[in-house]
Amino acid sequence: LDALIAIGGDGSLSILHELARRGNWNLVAIPKTIDNDVACTHWSIGFDTAVNTIVDALTRLTFTAASHDRVMVVEVMGRTAGHLALHAGIAGGADCILIPEIPYSIEAVCRQINDLHDRWGRRFAIVVVAEG
């Protein structure tokens, strides 16, 4: 065995880290996680696909929310990292994005949604929430 290549997220890369700590291995780590939460990387494999899939869903939900005067809350994956919710929410035109890195209160979220109605006459909203 000349080298070990690990393609994965936190779990796979933590195993690789442990191998590096224990011995003299030639190791290559390739981040692959939709969470996009691997340190020292800008993008990970899978993140862009996940963002675009969520944006497609948000586009469809926006039409449904508008036609039925609803507030739609969409929970996206990401564990304790809000990268996926933030990027997809911005690209998908969400009215409110809630991520674990920024504390929020339900009261503030309700005020923001009510402001859409009071200021712009909007009778619907899209809220994206990271699962963490």
Segments predicted by a language model, with ranges:
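Accessory alpha-helical/coil subdomains and C-terminal extensions
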Residues: 6-8, 16-18, 23, 47-132
